[in-house]
UniProtKB/Swiss-Prot annotation:
Pathway linked to the protein: Amino-acid biosynthesis; L-cysteine biosynthesis; L-cysteine from L-serine: step 2/2
Cofactor or coenzyme needed: pyridoxal 5'-phosphate
InterPro entries: Cys_synth, Cys_Synth/Cystath_Beta-Synth, CysK, P-phosphate_BS, TrpB-like_PALP, TrpB-like_PALP_sf
Single Gene Ontology BP annotation: cysteine biosynthetic process from serine
EC number: 2.5.1.47
Residue numbers binding hydrogen sulfide: 8, 35, 269
UniProt xrefs under NCBIfam families: cysK, cysKM
One of the Pfam families matching this protein, by short name: PALP
Keywords: Allosteric enzyme, Amino-acid biosynthesis, Cysteine biosynthesis, Pyridoxal phosphate, Transferase
Lineage, top ranks: Bacteria, Pseudomonadati, Pseudomonadota, Gammaproteobacteria, Enterobacterales
Protein name, per record: Cysteine synthase
Name of the encoding gene: cysK
Amino-acid biosynthesis recorded as keyword: yes
Binding site for pyridoxal 5'-phosphate: 72, 177-181, 273
Amino acid sequence: MSKIYQDNSLTIGNTPLVRLNRIGNGNILVKIESRNPSFSVKCRIGANMIWHAEKNNNINKNVKLIEATSGNTGIALAYVAASRNYRLTLTMPETMSIERKKILKSLGAELILTDGRYGMKGAISKANDIISRNPSKYFLLKQFENPANPEIHQITTGPEIWNDTNGNLDILISAVGTGGTITGITRYIKKIKRKKNLISIAVEPSESPVITQFLAGKAIEPGPHKIQGIGPGFIPKNLDLTIIDQVITVSSEEAILTAKELMKKEGILAGISSGAALYAAIKIQQQKKFSDKKIVVILPSSGERYLSTELFSEL
């Protein structure tokens, strides 16, 4: 029986869950999100946010999509916009990798770079400034607060993990950018499947531990880091902290070294945020009470998107 997709945005999901054999004790399973159509977990939200905008009549051929991005969401939006014939403007910190910039342009997006010192806040501010000058011309997708973001993980990623493990998982680990991935998956497993004993662990950069600071009642003090795609420097509205059980901080160096180890030992090309999530899993598994637990780790993107970064600097 043949199956033909009507456009590339419809091909998201059904990414493989793979057991690690030489990292950890055999109980770490990684979900390889680079198998999505534009090679990252963000393909899911890129598609769903645009689908929702279509359903709600927010966009047409005369309205230009706009979004602030650190790269992967922008690439996801660009491939969906191209496949469904929409125009797209993206604002992005200049510090993001050259691979991301070139891919965005190749997919037809207009790319506006912002001062890297201000991170994602600067990119968001620039997008809002552009809209304020001509609000009828643009539709802002707002990945950090758009409910279509966690929704797609609740209806696709969560069920995929549940079905592939037959519900036999104890710990979920995901690095946090917008918060949509960990929120959507956790909602599905804890609320729909009622596995309330799932331990859901968020990962953030130790150089910019804003979630940790917030939960401790401290002032939020973001800082620069090298784990592209996570640690935006604020608490995203799409991050539901009421269902997150633990937050682990990982340094940029730890994330990079672990991503390298994953490539060499397991043959899995992975980005820096994947290294951060896996590092957290390794540390958790080293604790006696978690040594026999089944751990699922989200690997957001592939290594090729970081060829110009420190991930490949020694080659």
